[in-house]
Amino acid sequence: MPVTDSIADYLTRLRNAGQAKNKTTDIPYSTQKENISKLLVEKGYIKNYTVITSDRFPFIRVELKYGSNGTFAIKEITRVSKPGRRVYEGKDLRKYLGGLGLLILSTSKGILTDKEAREQGVGGEVLFRIL
C-alpha cells in the first residue's frame, strides 16, 4: 500500500527506531527527506545519514543519536501540516516554545528552521515541530 504522507512516515520511522533504541533506521529516499536529514544533523538531533542506492530502490540510512544516559536526542517530533490540512506561516513567524523547540518549514529558499526563516524574512509550509 502506498504511503500518502511520506514526511509523516519519515518522522514515525525516526520515532519508532528511537523508542526501540536502534542505532540506525532505513527510510525510502526523496530529495525532501534528504534535506530534512541534513538539517537534523546540523541541529544535532541525529548523528549522521547516508544515501544508499541499491538495485531496487534508493534509501536513506539514518544514524540515531542518544545521550550519555541512553535517552533519544529527539524528545518529541510531531507533524503539523498534513495532506488534508496544510498549515502555512508568514514571514512574521513566532517562536515555538519560546525558542526551546524548532519548527521546520518548507520555504522558497529550501527546508529551514523557524529561526532561519525569520532571519531570511520568508514564510512557508510548517512541516513538523521538534523538541
From Swiss-Prot:
GO terms for molecular function: rRNA binding; structural constituent of ribosome. InterPro entries: Ribosomal_uS8, Ribosomal_uS8_CS, Ribosomal_uS8_sf. Pfam families: Ribosomal_S8 (PF00410). GO terms for cellular component: ribonucleoprotein complex; ribosome. Gene3D superfamilies: 3.30.1370.30, 3.30.1490.10. GO terms for biological process: translation. Keywords: Ribonucleoprotein, Ribosomal protein, RNA-binding, rRNA-binding. The keyword rRNA-binding applies. It comes from the Bacteria. Belongs to the universal ribosomal protein uS8 family. HAMAP family: Ribosomal_uS8_B (MF_01302_B). One of the primary rRNA binding proteins, it binds directly to 16S rRNA central domain where it helps coordinate assembly of the platform of the 30S subunit. Part of the 30S ribosomal subunit. Contacts proteins S5 and S12. This is Small ribosomal subunit protein uS8. It comes from Prosthecochloris aestuarii (strain DSM 271 / SK 413).
